Regions:
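Active-site-adjacent bridging/hinge elements
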Residues: 105-117, 212-227, 363-366
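Charged boundary/loop elements
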Residues: 16-75, 140-156
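Conserved polymerase palm-domain catalytic core
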Residues: 98, 102, 149-153, 157-161, ...
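Short, solvent-exposed helix-loop connector elements
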Residues: 123, 227-232, 331, 347-361, ...
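Extended C-terminal regions of large enzymes
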Residues: 393-395, 400-495
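A conserved non-catalytic segment of reverse transcriptases
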Residues: 297-372
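Phosphate/adenylate-binding "loop-and-lid" substructures adjacent to NTP/NAD/dNTP-binding pockets
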Residues: 50-121
Length: 496
């Protein structure tokens, strides 16, 4: 072999495997194309948008990222009607190479039902993994357009936005003495199930053949195939994008023809929304008809029973919180129904742990308490946190009393409440696999720092390079907050 041929052979890149994929480079390549799509959308160059979408959906990086998204989300091990799962790295890599538009035909969805908090069942339609990956691939090409065209005060299913942003916007709208005294709580009847296919196919800037195939795939239930003539499946990865595109423009519709003195403001999270107004008559006679007309064009309608107009002094619920004014002071507190749901979960978890170790119980209980506290930490939740801590303490005392019915209270306190070195903290000492001694303590909700959330800018677009430093700064700030929460002395595994 010559030196030249030897050099050529050594420069041949190794075969691609799932573990050797340079994921930062893959994400960078996809984001670069997405930013070009967003720029073309802003300029109204729709032919260029279509061309860039084609490039993105046929790129290897986007296909790899689509499969990565499908195989890392919570439903990765839930199969569709074909009962296929991607367990190995080779299967994942082959799945990415198999994402091709030519000859593609989606399989029907698998219909299952999941319980809702009110006891009813919610239908969930599950695509196959291959169909999920195809949807994830085309969602990468649709997301920059949806983000560019989105309403300023839409916060659900959008990159860089969350429930806390929506609630903070509500606070800004309602906290002042001169803020609107009336609120319309909007509820869309079966939003995901009733969106008009005709409207989506006419207005959504996506490959029409692919979109039509997904919308009309049908679903299997009890060995019977049912057609789908309306709606977008709640189990589909592209469904939240389609729902947002259908509902964007609602903010402009409710504000059309209003004046500053009408105090009409709008906030939406997915299909939940609120509209403020200076008078009940304004919301009833002007805003509500505008909403009805807007939704009718999309095959949707308001739920007359659940769409109500409420004075802010009475309060209303939004995203698991109760927003109510006491005099001139607006408070955002955890909704009573959500507190009760948490109490029920705590009770069932502790009851089911009678035969488990203290450490096993804490490893189940702490993530539940910490997650709930972090969600409600931006409102007036301190009093609720304290009451819940006492509730947990009572349930745990009953749990240990049942385990040791003949032991004294002093003995129980020494065994179960002394390892952390703090009086009254439910804790246990354990050893790691390396033999190191550690203490696992109950997470105290009252130790959670209450702080105002810094709302995202209404015009911020993660696919616009002008906002790249802005979102990077917000990301770093969020990690600092999470880090402080995660390393609180109570509830974490810490050295003794």
């Amino acid at each position: 072999m010559t030196v030249e041929s030897s050099t050529d052979a050594s420069s041949t890149p190794p075969p691609l495997t799932w573990k050797t994929i340079d994921w930062p480079h893959v994400r960078q390549e996809v984001r670069r194309l997405q930013m070009r799509i967003a720029k073309a959308t802003q300029a109204g160059h729709w032919r260029k948008v279509q061309a860039l979408q084609w490039v993105l959906t046929h790129s290897r990086s986007a296909k790899l990222l689509a499969v990565h998204r499908v195989t890392t989300n919570r439903g990765a091990h839930t199969p569709g009607v074909d009962n296929v799962r991607w367990r190995t790295d080779r299967q994942k890599l082959q799945a990415a190479f198999n994402l091709k538009r030519h000859g593609y035909r989606p399989r029907p969805l698998r219909r299952v039902y999941i319980p809702k908090p009110n006891g009813k069942l919610r239908p969930l339609s599950i695509p196959t993994l291959h169909d999920r990956a195809m949807q994830a691939l085309y969602a990468l090409a649709l997301a920059p357009i949806a983000e560019t065209l989105a309403d300023r005060n839409s916060y659900g299913f959008r990159e860089g936005r969350c429930c806390a942003d929506a609630l903070e916007q509500c606070f800004k709208m309602l906290a002042r003495k001169t803020s609107a005294p009336w609120v319309l709580e909007g509820d869309i009847r079966a939003c995901f199930d009733e969106i008009s296919h005709e409207w989506l196919l006419t207005h959504v800037p996506l490959d029409k053949a692919m979109l039509r195939a997904w919308l009309q795939a049908g679903y299997w239930e009890k060995d019977q195939l049912f057609p789908t003539s309306a709606g977008t499946p709640q189990g589909g990865l592209i469904s939240p994008l389609l729902a947002n595109l259908a509902l964007d423009g609602m903010e402009q519709a409710v504000k059309a023809g209003t004046r500053a003195g009408d105090k009409v403001h709008f906030v939406r999270y997915a299909d939940d929304f609120v509209v403020t107004g200076a008078t009940r008559e304004l919301l009833e006679q002007k805003v509500k008809p505008a909403l009805t007309a807007f939704l009718h064009q999309r095959g949707l309608e308001l739920s007359e029973q659940k769409t109500v107009i409420t004075p802010i002094q009475t309060g209303f619920n939004f995203l698991g919180h109760t927003l109510r004014k006491y005099g001139d002071k607006l408070l955002i507190t955890p909704a009573k129904s959500k507190v009760q749901i948490l109490r029920d979960k705590i009770r069932r978890l502790i009851q089911a742990a009678l035969g488990r170790t203290q450490a096993a119980l804490l490893r189940q209980l702490n993530p539940l308490l910490r997650g709930w506290a972090n969600y409600y930490r931006n409102g007036a939740a301190k009093a609720t946190f304290g009451k819940l801590d006492y509730y947990v303490w009572r349930k745990l005392w009953r749990w240990i009393s049942r385990r040791h019915p003949k032991k004294s209270s002093a003995w129980l306190k020494r065994k179960y409440f002394s390892a952390a070195g703090e009086q009254g903290v439910f804790s246990v000492r354990y050893h790691t696999q390396k033999g190191q001694s550690r203490v696992l303590a109950l997470y105290q909700l009252a130790s959670t720092t209450i702080e105002r959330h810094l709302k995202v800018r209404g015009t911020a677009n993660p696919y616009d390079p002008r906002y790249t430093p802005y979102f990077a700064q917000r990301h770093c700030f969020a990690w600092r907050i999470r880090g402080a929460s995660r390393h609180t002395p109570r509830g974490a595994a810490t050295p003794p």
